[in-house]
């Protein structure tokens, strides 16, 4: 949680030692500063108001003090310019503004389940995380199976649409497979996208989207 000269020098020493021993690093609690150019074994950095902050987020008035969904569609435009981002996504307990509250024992996220799932494609994170309890992932097997098969590095990235603080749509290719994810703030929205990166002909897709009751139960989703 520091970035003074002593800490940065120490980070370089740790990275060099880890490289000699063929180890990779995730500098949690430290914002990116370009070290991965010299030491590509440094895979990720925190430097972001990530999911863990939900555990102690206070309520003010009719909702949480911090608007996390808006932050989630702001950080990729700004913070990710500096490098990969260890947000630690993957909450399986999800809540809308009206029923969200900070809780260390039973933490939850702001926004929908699919909002969390989309982070695994939209956020650059060569070393990715599953931040929730293992037993919750066992209970939510369709969600877990989908997250598990998303690559952490890609061959091609395209920004399809977005407005800072409002929404974003990203398509990423690994081999011959495209992964497309969209995230929004609290505002629901419909978008029309041009998928001209796909070859001519027919294509198969697995889709996850907010369910019809997601405005009341944020864990609700539909798979097609």
Predicted feature residues:
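Carbohydrate-binding surface patches
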Residues: 164-203
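Conserved, mostly hydrophobic/aromatic
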Residues: 25, 122, 180
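Active-site proximal loops enriched in glycine and acidic residues that flank catalytic Cys/His/Asp
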Residues: 1-4, 27-30, 47, 133, ...
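Flexible loop/turn segments at secondary-structure boundaries
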Residues: 2-6, 32-37, 94-96, 129-131, ...
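Aromatic- and carboxylate-enriched substrate-binding clefts and catalytic-loop regions
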Residues: 1-107
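Catalytic cores of secreted or luminal carbohydrate-active enzymes
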Residues: 114, 118-160
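Solvent-exposed beta-strand/loop surfaces of large extracellular or lumenal domains
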Residues: 207-224
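Acidic/polar loop patches that form or flank catalytic/metal-binding clefts of enzymes
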Residues: 22-29, 52-57, 126-137, 154-158, ...
